[in-house]
Amino acid sequence: MTTNHLILDFSHVYCDEKIPKNDKVHWMDCSDITECDLYCSKRAEEIRARIAPYGIHGIHFWDSGNYHYVTGIMTTLIKQKISLILLDHHTDMQKPMIEQMTSCGDWAGKVIKTNPWLVRSRNKPVSDCQPMVYGNIPRDGGVIRAFHCIRY
């Protein structure tokens, strides 16, 4: 298993950060991908194509909350039982406003409904679960605002 830490840069938000060059961190410029800010259309499948060669092992940073749905994309690359741990300051399980598109607000609900590999820690189907609030992340500057963990 190769560990690849990824920085997915959609809006150049990381340009002001003093991130040292490191062979174990892959900086991926995604600013050329269209139709992916807040809502992700089918044309933005390019995101999955760019992540796939690196795999999902490692720590991944993606821009802002507008791109939280990238976690959902990553779950599609795993073909074994997984648990999803989600800490966020807003729900990612809303009903979609636009059915054909995935948003930063509805991706987790879609993963729960569609990913056959997603299970609770006691191997009960997630479809039997009620949504739970796992925590509240402060919105202060310089603080991580959301944490998504895929366990398998």
Outline where the language-model segments fall.
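Conserved alpha-helical scaffold segments that buttress catalytic/binding sites
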Residues: 2-152
